[in-house]
Every structure is written in C-alpha cells, then in structure tokens.
Regions:
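A short, N-terminal "cap"/entry segment at the start of jelly-roll beta-barrel domains
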Residues: 2-47, 57, 85, 122-135
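Conserved short histidine dyad/triad with adjacent acidic residue
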Residues: 44-61, 96
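Short, conserved beta-strand element in jelly-roll/cupin
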Residues: 49-50, 61-76, 115
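Short histidine-centered beta-strand/loop micro-motifs
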Residues: 56-61, 78, 85, 103-105
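Short acidic-glycine-tyrosine-enriched beta hairpin
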Residues: 80-97
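Ligand-binding loop in jelly-roll beta-barrel domains
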Residues: 96-121
C-alpha cells in the first residue's frame, strides 16, 4: 500500500509539472535535435491488478488505448478474433472504436498499466468464458 501511495504522489507531481510547462523547443543536453514538450491534458492512465482469470467487459475507446503488462501475463481479445497473450513488458495498442477486452491469463495474475488518448470509453457486455478462451 505504501508503494502505491508513493507512486501516486510522485506520479501526480510529474503530471502536475508536465501540465505547468509551456511547450518550448530548445536545446537540452538530454536530447539530440528539436524536441518539444507537448500538452498532455487529454491523456489519462491507470494501473490495475487482475487476479488470474479476471478481465474487463467488452469496450471501446473513442481515441484508442495502449495497454502494458507491467508484471504477470496479459490476455487480450478483439471482436471477431482469437485472444493474444503477452508476457511482462509486452504491450498492445487498440485503435479508436475497436471493441476489445483485456485481463489476466487463467492461471497467472497481471498488473496492467493503461493509457487512453482522450474521448469516451463505451462499455458493452461482459466477456464470457467462451470469448475469453477463444483461440
């Protein structure tokens, strides 16, 4: 719990700092070429722990979503396709308005980080066991 609180405090400070900065191109010893800090007001994110077999309902994101397996093993599915699995460090981008679900594999938990690029999330029906296990 202390780790989560520390991450939220540090993360909140970084987000606040990024919002406070005005985009300005310039020279920076950490970059080569012109690099500009951009506004991130529409970007949101989250971190979730899924127990083995846990998953989201079907849903879509108006402007897409990036999901990342921080630890454990992740399973994802898109409407009309079989599932895919990713080890820790793996990620998947889901384009705008593509119906999908994601969560842990049947035998392994998952810590997932997700990033949305603005817009609404449209929640649909629960992902059935048959859909979750469809190859």
């Amino acid at each position: 719990m202390r780790i989560i609180v520390a991450v939220l405090i540090v993360g909140g400070g970084l987000v606040t700092m990024s919002f406070a900065q005005t985009p300005q191109p310039g020279s920076d010893p950490n970059f080569t070429g012109v690099v500009t800090v951009m506004d991130a007001k529409d970007i949101t994110g989250g971190r979730r722990n899924f127990e083995a077999g846990a998953r989201t309902a079907w849903h879509s994101h108006e402007n897409g979503q990036l999901i990342y397996a921080q630890s454990g093993r992740m399973r994802t599915g898109r409407r009309g396709q079989g599932f895919k699995e990713y080890d820790a460090g793996g990620s998947e981008y889901t384009p705008p308005n593509v119906e999908h679900w994601h969560g842990a594999t049947p035998k392994e938990p998952l810590v997932q980080v997700n990033i949305q690029f603005g817009g609404a999330t449209k929640w649909l029906t629960k992902t059935t066991d048959e859909e979750y296990n469809k190859r």
